[in-house]
Amino acid sequence: MCGRCKTPLLADNKPVTVTDATFLAEVERSPLPVLLDLWAPWCGPCRMVAPVIEEVAAEMAGRVRVAKLNVDENPVTAARFHVQSIPTLLILKGGREMERIVGVQPKAEIVQRLQRIAA
């Protein structure tokens, strides 16, 4: 909440879809830490983790921004972060990678890592 005008700040309660073209504005310039889900539609484990990512976005709204990037459609950003396997979750702050989670992990593990960065 803005201390001046009392409006919510980036109260995203759902993941935002980002592309190579929107990455700078949506992720790098975010005032909040960002959980970036790098995924592809054909990836079974990516589909398994998708509901967890939705829950994390809802629970951490206002403290963390959650974004999803399809690696097949956005190869530039995937290459920039040297993504070798998916799902890969990156926790970014100021556009810099702070943590990397590869593969399906329990929600509690993801939240714990986010809380450390967002504190």
Predicted regions and their residues:
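Conserved residues in the N-terminal Rossmann fold of short-chain dehydrogenase/reductase
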Residues: K68
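Proteins that catalyze or organize thiol-disulfide redox chemistry
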Residues: M1-L35, A40-R65, E73-A119
